[in-house]
Amino acid sequence: MNIKDIGVIISKKPLKENTFIIRVFTKNHGLYSGVIKASSKKNKFIYQEGNIVDFLWQARLHEHIGIAKCELIKSYTGYFIINKAKLYAFNSVKFLIQELFHEREEHSIFFAFLINYLDNLSKNFCFRDYINFELNLLAETGYKIDLTKCCVSHVTTDLTYVSPKSARALSYKVGKPYRDKLLILPKFLLSEDSKITLEEKKQALTLTNYFFNRYLFHNNRQVEARKEFIEYITNI
């Protein structure tokens, strides 16, 4: 059987000399793995992590790992490796996708979001964009955090907290009596124009980390690349 799609290479591991297993996050078929041969310099460039490719997968049976062939559409790798913030962000992104998405499970809408994120990241690292990636990833896996209004009073102003139980925002007035049990809602998530402080970065990462740990990182397992990103971005 054959599958043809567009995708982003998110993993490349050696199998034997000049032979690798790549993992590609595709638009219409989700994560797919395949064996490739990359003997020439040109082929090795095509199969770098972060590249957008036309992806062809062939196997006798669907459950087989299959043989993969790719044609390069766009390469982002060079933009990421020259900037630490971009590189750490991309590494976190690719490992989160591998950790949280099931093999061969379609995520076509999220794929479009990812392509837009990578395009923006290639131009400039933006912490707001990264957190929006994590929020979108949580939503895609079924755990959307609703920051549009207070879940009790329904007001849309003075939103200050997030309930760890409902994953919904709370106003300052409603949440104040329970503030020790609530998560802080960073102000920059409510306003595109606000400057992001170091404290707000930590608050935002604490917010998404809580829901990753509660629902998705089983047995408190952490994604090492995400930990490295957090360590870097909160110490610059």
UniProtKB/Swiss-Prot annotation:
- Name it: DNA repair protein RecO
Keyword annotations for this protein, in alphabetical order, are: DNA damage, DNA recombination, DNA repair
Mind telling me which SUPFAM superfamilies this protein's record contains? ArfGap/RecO-like zinc finger
Q: Which organism is it from?
A: Rickettsia typhi (strain ATCC VR-144 / Wilmington)
Supply one GO CC term from the record.
bacterial nucleoid
The GO annotation for biological process reads: DNA recombination; double-strand break repair
- Pfam families in UniProt: RecO_C (PF02565), RecO_N (PF11967)
**Which gene codes for it?**
recO
Q: In UniProt terms, what function does this protein have?
A: Involved in DNA repair and RecF pathway recombination.
